[in-house]
């Protein structure tokens, strides 16, 4: 009986899978007509544009509902929405801290939540959702699983089992751990034997899938990132268009915010808007050998874009955790592959690189760049250049407003605005050609004037952006929400690799409180103020004056241009984010500080 059940499950998997092999190993299909690459100068991908147009019909009604519920005063919601304001959600890197805190923030935006917040409906109103590194685990796993609501995910308790690290996923069960790594060994080795280059990211991506793609047969071995377009939520235009961010990195080079090539991994295409590439390739056919975008034969590779591999690419900094396998009984092929990147002094510098061979952009129309000259495309963790909040994909799409959720570990594992600063600075480099990002202050100002302890809006007045661009109305209003403690000390180490269920829930609950401002308890106008930020750029474009309600909101939340020149005052995490004491947030009354959180430096202590 068990044999027939296994056969039936295999056949069902074949039907559901879009991979031609129903395995982790890619296969071959007939090539479509024409080139598989395109120039970024052509604008948004035609399939993406068609999806966003269909999506906006849904998003418009959801945004209308949100704005009505937000009690916008003296504002004609339905008349205004004919102007099509668009929203993008950006979730930062930061390991499981970023995934879990971001999950709570996303839950606060989701109208499907069991306990809706004052911001419920923002997710349904959004056109795009972007994640990098730990944020890619959030975006990638939810999109792959049909945009499952976070609270449903927790109730079902199948995904995001992170009670043990990836290295020993089954805890003390040595037999199951050995079987898991034996299976991963077989999958990666089979891919190599089929003629495809493999790297440590293949191993890491397959391990990561045990936590993020648990609902799929064989932990999503044959589930592709391009398969997201076949999910019910995508087919019904109910999902913000999902994007994962990574960076192009040549071996033995160091990435900076002014020289990196920011790659987008979307269900339709992969590539970059940056001058160092300005090309995209069809996601379905990555792995195909191309010459200036055209297949060199009639057979195209299909199945290379494994969803776990893509999430592993965006978070490849965590490849380093696999060095713990050197002392474990794993198959020789796997041991040799991992040892190459963890023990060899030269290769160890490149442990964070995912290899895409052949390079789809080889000999492309931008052939004078290093990327186009290389036979292998090397991609790395999306946050390695300091732009730890994936803003650029949304800037290129000229959205009206960006929610920037920052879980970075800049100072004592709290954000200090560095991610936004790096993106602001980039626009003045050659790689920043064609982008504009609103003014932001330095890190000292972010921390010491409370811009990380409560939400802050940037780019509030388009007329102040004229020195950055002529197209001032294409610059988004940025709604910045930094990780901070409310009900849990959420500044856990990026490299904390396992969380108990209590810790997991604590992180998610705190993220919910960060986004919702304790579900409106700290400001009963918070939802209205968010609404004011969403509509601001379109109001300016149309010449509509702000209401008195919105003017008051902007006085409370917009950065006013102040630059702090004094001595550091220490962290300030009072409820309001405005007082001079952190007395309410210490190990005696907030959970989590003994789970990896770092104690605060109190302002009142510094003044003594």
UniProtKB/Swiss-Prot annotation:
Organism, as annotated: Candida albicans (Yeast)
Subcellular location(s) of the protein: Secreted
Family named by the database record: Belongs to the lysophospholipase family.
Gene Ontology biological process terms in this record: glycerophospholipid catabolic process
Top-level taxonomy: Eukaryota, Fungi, Dikarya, Ascomycota, Saccharomycotina
Cellular component annotations (GO), alphabetically ordered: cytosol; endoplasmic reticulum; extracellular region; plasma membrane
Glycosylation sites: 259, 365, 450, 464, 491, 572
Protein's name according to its UniProt entry: Lysophospholipase 2
A single MF term (Gene Ontology): phospholipase A2 activity
Catalytic activity field: a 1-acyl-sn-glycero-3-phosphocholine + H2O = sn-glycerol 3-phosphocholine + a fatty acid + H(+)
Keyword field: Glycoprotein, Hydrolase, Lipid degradation, Lipid metabolism, Secreted, Signal
Main location: secreted
């Amino acid at each position: 009986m068990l044999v027939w059940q296994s056969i039936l499950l295999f056949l069902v998997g074949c039907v559901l899978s879009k991979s031609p092999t129903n395995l982790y190993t890619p296969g071959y299909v007939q090539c479509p007509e024409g080139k598989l690459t395109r120039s970024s100068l052509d604008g948004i991908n035609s399939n993406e544009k068609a999806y966003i147009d269909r999506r906006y019909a849904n998003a418009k009604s959801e945004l209308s509902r949100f704005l009505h519920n937000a009690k916008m005063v003296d504002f004609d919601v339905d008349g205004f929405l004919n102007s099509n304001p668009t929203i993008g959600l950006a979730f930062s890197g930061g390991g499981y801290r970023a995934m879990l805190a971001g999950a709570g923030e996303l839950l606060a935006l989701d109208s499907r939540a069991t306990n809706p917040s004052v911001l419920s409906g923002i997710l349904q109103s959004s056109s795009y959702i972007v994640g990098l590194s730990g944020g890619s685990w959030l975006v990638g796993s939810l999109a792959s699983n049909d945009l499952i609501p976070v609270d449903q995910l927790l109730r079902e308790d199948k995904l995001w089992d992170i009670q043990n690290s990836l290295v020993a996923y089954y805890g003390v069960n040595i037999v199951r751990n050995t079987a898991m790594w034996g299976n991963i060994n077989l999958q990666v080795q089979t891919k190599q034997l089929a003629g495809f280059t493999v790297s440590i990211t293949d191993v890491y991506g397959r391990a990561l899938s045990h936590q993020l793609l648990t609902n799929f047969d064989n932990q999503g071995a044959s589930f592709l990132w391009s398969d997201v377009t076949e999910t019910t939520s995508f087919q019904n235009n109910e999902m913000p268009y999902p994007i994962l961010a990574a960076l192009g990195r040549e071996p033995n080079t160091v990435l900076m915010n002014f020289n990196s090539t920011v790659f987008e991994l979307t269900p339709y295409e992969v590539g970059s808007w940056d001058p160092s590439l300005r090309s995209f390739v069809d996601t379905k056919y990555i792995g195909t050998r191309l010459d200036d975008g055209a297949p060199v034969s009639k057979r195209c590779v299909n199945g290379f874009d494994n969803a776990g591999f893509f999430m592993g690419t965006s978070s490849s900094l965590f490849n380093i955790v696999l060095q713990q396998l050197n002392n474990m009984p794993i198959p020789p092929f796997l041991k040799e592959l991992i040892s190459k990147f963890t023990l060899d002094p030269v290769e160890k510098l490149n442990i964070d690189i995912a290899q895409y061979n052949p390079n789809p952009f080889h000999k492309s129309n931008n052939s004078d760049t290093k990327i186009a000259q290389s036979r292998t495309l090397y991609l790395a963790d999306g946050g390695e250049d300091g732009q730890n909040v994936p803003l650029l994909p949304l800037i290129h799409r000229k959205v009206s407003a960006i929610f920037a959720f920052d879980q970075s570990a800049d100072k004592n594992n709290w954000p200090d605005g560095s991610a936004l600063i790096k993106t602001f600075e980039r626009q003045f480099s050659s790689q920043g050609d064609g982008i504009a990002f609103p003014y932001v202050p330095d890190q000292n100002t972010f921390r010491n004037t409370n811009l990380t302890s409560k939400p802050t809006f940037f780019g509030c007045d388009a007329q102040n952006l004229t020195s950055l661009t002529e197209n001032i109305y294409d610059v988004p209003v940025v709604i910045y929400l930094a990780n901070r403690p409310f009900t849990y000390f959420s500044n856990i180490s990026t490299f904390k690799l396992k969380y108990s269920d209590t810790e997991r829930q604590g992180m998610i609950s705190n993220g919910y409180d960060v986004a919702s401002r304790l579900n409106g308890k700290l400001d009963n106008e918070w939802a209205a103020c968010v609404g004011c930020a969403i509509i601001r750029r379109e109001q300016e474009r149309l010449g509509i004056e702000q209401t008195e309600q919105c003017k008051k909101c902007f006085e409370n939340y917009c950065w006013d241009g102040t630059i702090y020149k004094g001595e550091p005052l220490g962290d300030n995490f009072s409820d309001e984010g405005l007082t001079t004491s952190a007395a309410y947030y210490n190990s005696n009354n907030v959970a989590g500080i003994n789970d990896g959180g770092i104690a605060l430096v109190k302002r009142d202590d510094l003044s003594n």
